[in-house]
Amino acid sequence: MVFIIKPDMRDLMENMVGARLAAHKTADGDNVEVCYAYQDFSSVPDFYTVPSDRVKPFGTVHALLCAREFVHEPFVVINADDYYGVDAFKTIYAELSKLAESGEGTMVGYDLCNTVSEHGTVTRGVCHVNEQGMLDRVVETFHLKP
C-alpha cells in the first residue's frame, strides 16, 4: 500500500495507519507492505515549469508521478478527500482481479449528480466516452454544484 503524503506527515501516518496495516496479512498470507511517497515538485517532468509562487501540490496525476517507483502491478487510486463506501472497494477489487496481466485499466465512476455537495462547490473528474462507450478522456472540472 502506498500513501502519497507531504513529508511532514510521515510520522503521523506511520503511527496512525501504517503500523496497523503492516500487522495485517494479504490474501497470499504476506504482510501488507506499506510505502510512503512524498508529493513534492521533484517529480514534476522536466518539460513543465512549476510557477515560482506555487506552494500547493498538483492533483491526482501529480500524486501518481510521485508514487511511480512503488507501482509495479495493477493498482487503485483512492483520494483521501472523497469516500464512496465499501461497495466501491468491492467493485474495484473485482475489476482489478480481471486485469492482472492485461495491461488495461479500469475505474469506478459515479453519476455526477450523486457526487456534488449541497455545502459548496466541488472539483470532479468528468468522464467523456466515445461512440463505442469507451472512456475517451477525463476532464478535471472545477466549481461544480447541484
Language model features: what each stretch is:
Residues 1-79, 84, 89, 98:
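Conserved N-terminal catalytic core of the sugar/cofactor nucleotidyltransferase
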